[in-house]
Regions:
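C-terminal regulatory domains involved in ligand/effector binding and gene-expression control
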Residues: 1-91, 96-307
Length: 307
């Protein structure tokens, strides 16, 4: 299977979830073997240089997965666009923005899926590299854990736990095996969510200024405040899977393995990536020159070529 990039550049504007400011975002094609890179067009000189994404640049995970370079350049809330890039198997792209934060759009990855569909996706000449998990790797923190296990495909299982009545109306656990399920149908529409008391607290600290009922599910003590309700009965846990897929794709390559998590979040997801990469016996790089040898979870990528 070959690497892929966008067929053409495409732009969109939106609002930063935390800054509340307008953000102009452009996705560009990029050369093979260049990976996913970001560039802040509002910064000059070295601060405005291209940043090649790696797990080691995620140095702020308090509210999202945020790039912080050694020069202090920030690119925040990258997990939703990374999740969409993962769904389309984009290996190489340059993402330019004129603000410190990717726009939140509607709180899901669906607007970014539409962007990729509009831009088109094309194969390149170099072989796509997959990161294959060879043995279990687990990271535990207080009251939460995540792990990779070997699996001939890509499967994600997550469990959430919140002490609010609204979360008791659906299962706290969701599992998706991409050998038989579609990311676009099952995951892409799930929106980020937050609690009313947290919204008030964040705004008091000049955070969450761009959040509203059009780009997040807002929950009070007992119910969902969005008049249209939920897009999936278990939208909360599905969004956590959307986030996890984006967090894991920060490694820059599709993963062959099973990911499980209990109360996972951006920090522990990133810690798991780093733990895998730190142990050379835990993984290997693989290529598939014959697409018939691809694990079934990645067959759908062959249907997503256009341009």
């Amino acid at each position: 299977m070959l690497q892929r990039t966008l067929a053409k550049s495409i732009s969109v504007t939106g609002v930063g979830l935390h800054s509340g400011e307008r953000v102009a975002l452009t996705l560009h094609p990029a050369p093979e073997n260049s990976g996913i890179s970001f560039r802040r067009t509002d910064l000059d000189g070295e601060m405005g240089e291209q940043i090649k994404l790696t797990p080691y640049l995620i140095n702020d995970t308090r509210l999202s997965s945020t790039i912080v370079t050694d020069k202090g350049v920030r690119v925040g809330t990258i997990e939703h666009i990374m999740s969409a890039l993962s769904a389309y198997g984009i290996d190489n792209a340059l993402i330019e923005l004129n603000a410190p934060e990717i726009p939140i759009m509607d709180g899901s990855s669906l607007p970014f899926i539409y962007l990729l569909q509009d831009a088109g996706v094309v194969d390149q000449k170099a072989q796509k590299r997959f990161l294959k998990i060879l043995k279990p790797v687990e990271v535990k923190e207080a009251g939460k854990w995540v792990r990779f296990t070997p699996y001939d495909g890509f499967k994600v299982t997550l469990t959430i736990e919140f002490d609010y009545p609204v979360f008791n109306r659906s299962s706290p656990t969701f599992e998706i095996d991409f050998a038989g399920k579609s990311y676009i149908d099952e995951i892409a529409r799930a929106r980020t969510f937050g609690f009313m008391h947290e919204v008030e607290m964040m705004r008091a600290h000049n955070l969450g200024l761009g959040g509203n009922l059009n780009n997040a599910i807002v929950i009070d003590d007992t119910d969902v405040l969005n008049p249209e309700g939920l897009r999936y009965p278990d939208e909360f846990v599905r969004h956590k899977i959307l986030d996890a897929i984006g967090d894991l794709y920060i490694v820059g390559h599709p993963l062959i393995g099973a990911f499980e998590g209990y109360k996972s979040g951006h920090a522990i997801n990133n810690a798991l990536l780093r733990a895998v990469l730190a142990d050379e016996t835990a993984y290997k790089w693989v290529e598939f020159s014959n697409s018939e040898d691809l694990p079934p979870a990645f067959h759908d990528l062959n249907l997503k070529k256009c341009g």
